[in-house]
Amino acid sequence: RRHPRLVVGLVGSEMCIRDRARTVKSLSCRNRIIMTGTPIENRLADLWSLFDFLNPGLLGNANEFKKFSKKLNHNPSGYSRLRKLIRPYILRRLKTDKTVISDLPEKIEMRTYAALSKKQILLYKNLTVEIKETIARTEGIQRRGIILSSLMKFKQLCNHPDQYLGTGGYGEKESGKFVRLREICETIYEKREKVLVFTQFKEITQPLAEFLAGIFQRQGLILHGGIPVGKRKKTIEQFQGPAYVPFMVLSLKAGGVGLNLTEANHVIHFDRWWNPAVENQATDRAFRIGQKKNVVVHKFLTKGTVEERIDMMLQEKSRLSQDVIAAAGESWITEMKDDQLLDLFKLTL
């Protein structure tokens, strides 16, 4: 796992085995095996890359598969055809299968809802009006860029008005998520347990850490992509050590892969990545071999907002695809018509 490009076997040998082979090159070998925990991490093209190594031509060429995957947004029943095609080539083992790991505790996942504050409601309504006017006069690549940018703004606003506005302060009462975070973490503190708080935004890691320090009455830790490798190792060792370090705030990308943080048995996704595979990888920093307690996972959502509606749509997609298709990021949202987008963005109180 430490050497994802390591190839076991030589060119021209009987068998090649690759680990995490999302960017594979042609190798001359008769038998091929790929080991991966996330066959589809960000987009369907990940799956095509794997099968282009395993069985070239099975899923067509890259352009053909791209056209096919685009159609799935409008015709989800096509997932069943794809599942049927690739099923004979996949041997899947889940950690939750007791025949695979007999002593792994339970994972309890729940959606945790927060109400917007009055300030958030006002800003949300203003942002919706602004976006409506903007997308009406744009098209093509520019329109898609505006939609993705708008989604980011909504996420920031749903986290905290100060994150969206780029101001300081981060008052608790101005964010429904901060209020819910206190409620959950006070219970964790009473039990002297530990929690991982994931966010996709580096800029809110420090405000979250300061807020949590007030709840736990002691300092926690922060881990994001800007922290040097040497310090990252010390940070992980400190969290996993015998001293009570109650929390770690992590950026989703920096903390999503390759870390062992089993001292925590609570995981909070403060904002959503909208990709089940990425979120599950982050959760698995705590829910993995070595964990002795049941792991409780909270996925924060603000009620009546774009967060709640996208989550509902993804649940429906997940049921249709039955986990063969993890996600296409947020790009599928950019293909929506104007009226569909406005219905997605509108605030329902």
Labelled PLM ranges:
Residues 20-100, 291:
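Conserved P-loop NTPase motor "coupling/switch" region that bridges the ATPase
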Residues 38-44, 56-59, 72-73, 118-121, ...:
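Conserved nucleotide-binding/hydrolysis micro-motifs of P-loop NTPases
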Residues 13-14, 18-24, 276:
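Substrate-gripping "pore-loop 1 plus following alpha2 helix"
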Residues 98-120, 125, 138-259, 330-349:
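Conserved Helicase C-terminal RecA-like lobe
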Residues 274-283, 287-349:
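A conserved SF2-helicase RecA2
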Residues 46-49, 259-272, 295-300:
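A short beta-strand element within the Helicase C-terminal
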Residues 31, 246-247, 266:
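Short, Asp-centered acidic motifs that coordinate Mg2+ and/or phosphate
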Residues 1-12, 17:
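Single conserved hydrophobic/aromatic residue that forms the stacking wall/gate
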